[in-house]
Amino acid sequence: MMLWGDRFINGFETPYNPMNGSRNGTHPAIKQIPRDILLCDWHYHLHESYPSVDQFEENGFDYVICGWRKQKAIRAFIEYATRHGKDHFKGYLHTNWGGIIPMLQYLVQDEAQQEEEEIRNYAECNRLGLELAWRGLN
């Protein structure tokens, strides 16, 4: 079973935005979650550190990190987890939260037809996610 890990992160003690951590008191529940649950640690913005990686390692949870639409953030998150993930870091799960039709159109068009910056970036992040899934993190 997989669970999103954000509800087990103390949102008042991390550099993440309010959506990436619990600010309603659910974070202590991490002590009650069975250790055979795979946590999905999602962060979509660039940070200098990702303390949830350290937290999940310290608490003995296997976890994957999850990115979305910012290539620099995806790469920084992967680099951090690769350096700090000791025994429990299991890989990368790419998320996609909308805009699938324009993104797919971008991926099949030639470069002369690719105009919209946001769609281009979004598609490139998906391409990066697919590449990582195919060849691995190294």
Where are these regions (language model features)?
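Substrate-binding groove of N-acetylhexosamine-processing glycoside hydrolases
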Residues: 1-138
